[in-house]
Amino acid sequence: MKKGQLFIGALTCLVASMSWGAMFPVADHALEFVDPFYFSFIRYGVVTIMLVILLLVREGKKSFHLEGKAKWIILFGVMAFTIYNVLIFLGQRLMGKSGIMTASIAEALMPMLSIVILWGYKHVKPKKYTMISILIAFLGASMVITKGNISFFFSLGDHLFSILFIFIGVLGWVVYTMGGQIFREWSTLRYSTLTCLFGTAITGIMTAILTAQGYVSVPSIKVIAAIKYDFLFMITLPGIIALLSWNYGIKILSSINGILFINFVPITTLLIMVIKGYNITAFDIVGTLFVIIGLILNNIYQRKEDYKQVLQKEKTNLTIT
């Protein structure tokens, strides 16, 4: 793989991760006015319309053919745009202000979950350096959020269902990220659009049923107007831009390497909290360094392995000739 491609892949994953890190503080304000179901449906309803128009213009009607992969498109769409987007914000809302950082640090679990899934389902044993890098990055993220206070984890028992919702949501996004590898022959735009279309449609159906049962209510125009800037941000940067950037980056780097960048989600959330008056501690600084070191180590070892493969191919070609 060319260095330029690796850089672009890393940059797009970083943009997506930092965008998602910024979304939790913004969502905290929006969720005071609207429930997670309508919040997710309205947000990705607009994103879906934008993606459909963009795909139609760039690739034409033929790109909407599912090519016998409907079940996978629906599965991954539900995982990302129903399970992840609804449950992670539901958990955040139920936890209150503490949900901002809890939902954010939960994202740092994604690399570990992806490795477990690959190891258990596909029997793909990760490289030793990848596992070490992930552990270092996760340790750093944990230090940033907990400030070294172990009791933080024990106090989470008071919010068992909230944590469970967030965890299931995160697991949904891991499955979606890994699912992109099945559609490598498709463009990033096509995979993003079709999964978003079906996932959001199912979220809409579920929201309509809950509304009919009286569990949630349709937000008024006045409510939407009160959080219009929240929606504008959520639809653009953590929405369509982050979605396309993430899927493109994962396509280049692979899910197991690209998902390491998700550790920048809690770091970004923390930086925003700092802007709001949060005091920086030694754990914040050391934890941030751990995350960066974890990413750099993985990148260095990956480059060495790629270089060895290139040398091996050259030796093989010389032997044949």
From Swiss-Prot:
Please verify whether the record's keywords include Cell membrane: yes
Q: Where is the EamA domain?
A: 18-146, 175-300
- InterPro entries the UniProt entry points to: AA-Vitamin_Transporters (IPR050638), EamA_dom (IPR000620)
What domain of life does the UniProt record list for this protein's source? Bacteria
From which residue to which does the signal peptide run? none
Q: How does it sit in the membrane?
A: Multi-pass membrane protein
Q: What UniProt keywords apply to this chain's record, in alphabetical order? A: Cell membrane, Membrane, Repeat, Transmembrane, Transmembrane helix, Transport
**Which segments of the protein form a coiled coil according to its record?**
none
GO cellular component terms attached to this protein's record: plasma membrane
Locate the transmembrane regions by residue number.
6-26, 37-57, 72-92, 100-120, 134-154, 160-180, 196-216, 223-243, 255-275, 277-297
Where does it mainly reside? membrane
Q: Where in the cell is it found?
A: Cell membrane
Under the heading PANTHER family, the entry gives:
INNER MEMBRANE TRANSPORTER (PTHR32322), S-ADENOSYLMETHIONINE_S-ADENOSYLHOMOCYSTEINE TRANSPORTER (PTHR32322:SF18)
Q: Which family does it belong to?
A: Belongs to the EamA transporter family.
Q: What name has this protein been given in UniProt? A: Uncharacterized transporter YrdR
